[in-house]
Amino acid sequence: MPQVELSAGTIDYEDTGGGGPAIVFGHGLIMDGTQWRHVIADLRTDFRCIAPTLPLGAHRQPMRADADLSMRGVAGLLGELLEHLELSEVTLAMNDWGGPQLLVGSAYDERLARLAICSCEAFDNVPPKGPAQLLPYIARMPGGIAATMLPFRFDRLRRLPLTWGWLSKRPVPKEVMDRWFAPATTQPGVRRDLRKYILSAKQGRRELVAIADALRRFERPALVAWAGDDRMMPKDHGPRLAGLLPQGHLEVVADSYTLIPEDQPATLAKHMRELMAR
């Protein structure tokens, strides 16, 4: 897997290559780019698909101790990657983690051509409603993150509503979940990074509320794909986001929880192809 040295540390990324328009995929907390594997398998024939592993708990190498791992800091790493790979006219896709929205109106804004906002944190929903809202409190306790990760070692516990059960309707394959959860269950440095991000939740909430003004000025094509049965992202946030974006187009994806790339990848890939044609 290719790697790149960014300001916070070494980041792994997948790159399908090719000369087509670039799509960069942002992933969720304690996940990596394999969250998009089905969608990428569909799109890679026509588009260059790039999926970095950001320091959100599934990264293999701990970041530098002084790294800014707030929501804005991690979003900045995504921007640094665009710059390092000399990408322009990028379609930026996101799901679960809402941080990529912070690139709109930033120093990296001119590299963006389109947005694909797919059931993710928005406005004041940080951390998202449900069990995740306990994480900032747990992270303040000594050993809290290590204790939180213990159930993720066991297959049966991963599907409980208090762990992963509300993220996808359909089970994520064991080997994919093993890949996601191994770093934070085995590496203290990765848990330190994850804790640092979680403790910045209040700051991230303020920044996602404030980004609404920048979204209003994003005069480029934008897809808002919202899961029809989402348990964690409020149903009204999809229409609100689409209404903010001057060229926003809303698609409600039926029979899906938050992880649309897991539950309805073919439908999402179809909507993304339509976005790329705009």
Task: Please annotate each region the language model reported.
Residues Q247-R278:
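Catalytic active-site module of serine/aspartate enzymes centered on a nucleophile-bearing elbow/loop
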